[in-house]
């Protein structure tokens, strides 16, 4: 027998979003929840023509993309009005959900694929999220916008030494690189690479999203300027990690 599929109307979907965030001790209002509903619908529709995500079922999008993007930032002290860059943002995670919940932040989203950047522009306009979308390779942008942001973030599968070289150059001295990682990665193994880039490991914290999936948060503090030779070109970053 096939499982019965429950179809929710718009008000029920709004309530569902609010309840899933509440499970993570995050309070959002109906207006914010409605933005998440609209974002999900738009992303799933757009995904038919541009590869954005393999997760398209509403309840899974809410937990595995939306809550997953916001929850780790509740564990870090982020002052009002902070500027940040989401490096290799893809479909806009974690940046867009974070900006829905923290509209005081000044977000820049960087991606190397123009098709995704077009989607990001349209998605942000649709739900009324202010952001700067930049089509660029992150290692090239990291030389142009060097030490310009209060924090950088990435929700990526790349190993921590690779991710650190892409992200830490963007961060002001005294700022943070907030990495959203899987629990399988040993963050301490990247401490040497992080030090070469002007950072030090401040916090590593394991947690779970509402469905029980395990996650690891790594917070890197920028304690000195990144040497001008970093970031290297992408071939060296990935083939010869620090």
Q: Language-model segments: which ranges?
A:
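Class I SAM-dependent transferase core
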Residues: 2-81, 85, 115-130, 135, ...
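Conserved SAM/SAH cofactor-binding pocket of Class I
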Residues: 67-156, 164-165
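Conserved beta-strand signature within the Rossmann-like core of class I S-adenosyl-L-methionine
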Residues: 174-184
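Residue-level signal for inorganic ion chemistry
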Residues: 43, 98, 120, 181, ...
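Helix-to-beta-strand junctions that scaffold the AdoMet/dcAdoMet cofactor pocket
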Residues: 102, 171-173
């Amino acid at each position: 027998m096939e499982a019965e599929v429950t179809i929710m109307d718009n008000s029920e979907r709004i309530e569902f979003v609010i309840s899933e965030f509440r499970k993570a001790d995050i309070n959002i209002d109906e207006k914010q929840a409605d933005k998440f509903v609209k974002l999900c619908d738009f992303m799933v529709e757009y995904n038919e023509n541009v590869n954005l995500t393999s997760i398209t079922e509403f309840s899974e999008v809410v937990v595995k993309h939306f809550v997953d993007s916001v929850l780790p930032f509740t564990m870090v002290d982020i002052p009002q009005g902070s500027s940040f860059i989401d490096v290799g943002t893809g479909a806009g995670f974690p940046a867009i959900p974070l900006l829905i919940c923290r509209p005081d932040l000044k977000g820049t989203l960087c991606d190397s694929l123009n098709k995704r950047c077009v989607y990001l522009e349209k998605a942000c306009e649709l739900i009324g999220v202010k952001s700067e979308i930049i089509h660029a390779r992150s290692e090239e942008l990291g030389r142009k916008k060097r030490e310009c942001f209060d924090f950088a973030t990435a929700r990526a599968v790349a190993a921590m030494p690779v991710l650190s070289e892409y992200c830490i150059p963007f961060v002001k001295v005294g700022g943070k690189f907030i990495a959203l990682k899987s629990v399988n990665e040993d963050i301490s193994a990247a401490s040497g690479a992080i030090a070469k880039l002007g950072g030090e490991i401040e916090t590593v914290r394991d947690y779970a999203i509402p469905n029980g999936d395990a996650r690891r948060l790594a917070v890197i503090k920028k304690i000195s300027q990144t040497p001008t030779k970093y970031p290297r070109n992408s071939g060296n970053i990935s083939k010869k990690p620090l």
